[in-house]
Amino acid sequence: MARSLVIVGAGPAGMSAAIAAQARGARVTVVDEAARPGGQIYRQAHPALKGGDFAEASERARKERLIGAFERVLERIDYRTETSAFALFKTGELHIASGSRTEVLRADAIILTTGVREIAVPFPGWTTPGVMYAGGAQALLKSQSVLAGRRIVVCGTGPLPIVVAAQILRAGGSVAALAMLNSLKVGGWQLPALWSGRELVREGLRYLATVIRARVPRLTSYVPVRVNGREQVESVVLARVDRRGVVIPRTEREVACDVVAVNYGFTANNELAAMAGIAMHHDPPRGGWLPVVDEFGHTSVAGIFAAGDAAGLRGALVAEAEGQAVGAAAAADSKEIARPDFRAGLAVALAARERLSAFQSAMQQLLLVPSGLWHLPTDETIICRCENVTLAALRDALTAGYLAPNTIKRVTRAGMGWCGGRTCLQAVSALAELHGAPSAAMMTPRPLARPIPLASLANRAAAGRS
């Protein structure tokens, strides 16, 4: 009998896994929160809206190829759009919600391809309307062809701020400044790894060329330290920092703008994996707390797999290659996987994953957040937006000896709000470390892993499934 699979997420890893598993005869269900496939990197506009694609031609070609291949198998799989997976248990029960209805899915295998989210570093004024993630500004362009503002300052680390600044310019927007925390200079020892990802390097250089041609002011080793404006962003103050992330005195520059788009790297969407009791390990450059997996995505819980950025930040190309390998493994039994011809059939995907992972490892040095940045917030700065927990309240708890994330959550309510700690967890953990907490600790995830309508739970209870 064909094996049944549920894949959570329809980004590059999820789509690739679905294609590979269906090709091996598996009965595949794909659950995704978006209305169309693609994930964050290959985000498409909602069918009722018109979005724009301001990416490089080579990236658009990869997107069209993979989404096209996924759409060709849609008639043979169960594809659940606009559906949230909000709980997963080691028994293999996956709880999902769509509209005002909930359902429990069970399958021979579950593949988590839940991706990553952006890291927030609080600073005075970061909750002012007009301050947003750089990825959020990019999502507006991709999904609706909407510019986030009239005059945008893009800040952060790694390649994404450059990409977002270039795409804003290509969409006809105005970038008032591009402030980068880290230099893009690399050492000679990294050249072989960069060569392995030369297609991505070329794309990055073309994005940078767009910014240079537009004569956008570019600042290196600068970060936003304060936003001015009560009801809306009016300007941002940028300051230079040293290698530790500590602000250098008398280096402040004020830039007039109505939007500040910030990215300080990414952390894995690991709530479902942790909730299921999967063994986790801590690897900050690759996304923080990650499930322990083998080369075919097996986790410590039988029948649950992880692939793509959810198993370690390595980008869309690695996610696609890994999704193919993990999808094939999840559709097979242990005897099939042990056969030499199984690995031989995946040789191209496994080689691509290894080659491109080397490139991403070289890039990860650009995504590290230096400890000095966590000193940017003042006592009045809100750390947990959902519960309005300020740095002063958090510091009182830390000074009293409450250093474990779960204890901080109970004492201050930081992480108890609508987002479940997804926005503030990095900041809370980093600030706790400054007070002597262990460097590797995480909040215990609880259902609901994603916000869902109360009507969904009410309807479930009314049907006798409390």
Where on the chain are the PLM-derived regions?
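Residues forming the flavin
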Residues: M1-T412, G417-W418, R422-S466
